[in-house]
Amino acid sequence: LVLQTAGNLATSQAVFTKLDNAIKLAQERNLHTVPTLYDAAQLVGECLRETTIHAQTIAQETDTKFRSSFILGGQIKGQSPEIYFIYPEGNCIRATTDTPFFQLGESKYGKPILDRSMNYDASLKSAMRAILISFDSTIRSNLSVGMPIDVLVYHNDSLQMPQGYRIDENDEYFASIRQHWSDGLRKILNELEDSPVSYWQ
C-alpha cells in the first residue's frame, strides 16, 4: 500500500503516526489486517476525521485550517489494484475507467494537461510523460511548488513495493521533455490559423 497526502502537515503526520502505531501495537483493525483496499481507505478516512475533529476542538478560537486529503493505492493479494481519494471529511471515492487518476494539493495548473491527454487505456510510458509535463506546468505557474518529484510505479500483481525514483533539478530526462514541451507549444501556436478580421473590430 502507498499513502500520499497534501494539506495541513500536523494533521497528515498525526494520521500517519496513528496508522503506524496501530500496526506496531498489533491492533485488531489496522492496514495489515483489513480485507480490502476499500476497508483500508475507510480506516484512513476514520483516522483522518478523528484527527481533524480533535485538532479543531483544541484550537476552537483560531483560524487554523486542519484539513488534509490522502490518496491510497496498492493491491491486496487475490484482488485487483485500486486507488482511492480520501477527502478531508473522511469519505472516499475509487478511481474508475472514466476517472483513472487523482491529484493532491496544487492541481489546477497541471490538471488540464492530464484531462486532455490521459484515459484508462493509456500506456504507462504515455502516462509518465503526461504526469511529468503536468508537474512542470504546476512548477512554472506556482512558486510554492518545486522539485524534487518522487516517482513510484507499481506493476500489477507484483505485490512488491517499487524502489521509486527521485527527479531533481539536474535530471536530464525531465529537463529534456519540459524543453520539448515548451518548444512544441510555441510551434503549434505559430502554426494555428490566424483569427478572422471580425475578431479585431
Regions found by a protein language model. Give the residues of each.
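N-terminal nucleophile
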Residues: 1-201
